[in-house]
Amino acid sequence: MKRVRVRRDHPYAPAWALVMLLVALTMYLVTEGVSAPGQQAALAPVEQVSWDIQPLSMSLVILSRAGDEATARIEAARYVARGAAGYVLPSSGEYLIAGAGYNSVDEAGRVMNKLGETEKLAASVATREAPEIAVRLTGKRAQADALIGAERALRDGTNALGEAAFRLDAGEIDLNGAREALLSVRAEAKKAREALEKASAGEPNQAAEEVAALLAAFEDASTTMLMGAGTSPLFFSSQMKYNYIDLRLRHIAFLSRLAGDG
C-alpha cells in the first residue's frame, strides 16, 4: 500500500511573506530613495549669487581734538556728561572727539552750524565711507541668502539704534520707548546671526564670520546698555550714540576690506 503523504498548509505563511516583503521595501526606500535632512543640505547645488552691496558712510560731528589718547578720553568724558557720544577716533597724528554720527554730510553740517551759533563751538565734520561693491558669492543658495540677510540686518539695526538715540533727544520717545526699540533690534540681530551661523556651519567663510562677529558685538552692546540700572535718558542717549558710531565704523571697515579683496 502506498503511503499517503499529507501536506499541512500553514495559514499564516502568506501573511508572513507579505510582512517580510514590506520590510524589505521599506529598507530600500530608506537607504536608496530618501535622504536625511543633513544629507539633503550637503547635496544642495553650488550656485553663483550676485551680491550688490550699497555704499555705506557716516559723517561725524567733531567737537574737539587732542594730541594724545589720554587727553582725548578726558575731553570725551566731558561731552558724555552732556549727552554726546564722546567717541575717540584716531586720525592722522591726532585724536578726534566725536559728539554724534549721521548718515549724510548735509545733516552733520547742519548740526555743526547749529553748535557754532548756539554754543560758539568750533566743530567740524569728518566722514568715513565704504564704496558700493559688487560681489559674486559661490556656494549654496541658503548660505548666500543668510549672508546677504545678515549684512542687511546689521545695516538696518545700526540705523535703528541711531534713530532711537535722536528720537530720545527730541522727546519723541521716553527712556522706556528707547529700551523697547533696543530690545527689538537686538532680537533681529540675534535672529540674523543665528541664521547665518546655521547656514555656514561646517563651511568656514571669512565674510560670514566677520558679519556674524559684528552682529554678536551689536547684541553685546545692546545687552550692556539694557542692563544699566538707573540710567538717565541723557546717559542712555550718549551710550546709544557711542555704539551707533562704533558699530557703523566697524561695518564700514569690513566693507572696505571686502572691496580691497575684490
Question: Could you say what each language-model-derived stretch is?
Answer:
Residues 1-8:
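N-terminal Lys/Arg-rich, disordered targeting/topogenic segments
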Residues 8-17, 255-261:
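Intrinsically disordered, low-complexity regulatory regions
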Residues 12-32:
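Hydrophobic membrane-insertion alpha-helices, especially the h-region
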Residues 38-139:
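Solvent-exposed beta-strand motifs enriched in subsets of small alpha/beta binding domains
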Residues 114-181:
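Charged, amphipathic alpha-helical linkers/stalks
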Residues 161-175, 192-203, 222-235:
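Secondary-structure edge/capping motif, primarily at the C-terminal ends of alpha-helices
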Residues 182-215:
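Mature extracytoplasmic domains of secretory-pathway proteins
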Residues 202-262:
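Extracytoplasmic/luminal low-complexity segments enriched in Pro/Gly and acidic/polar residues
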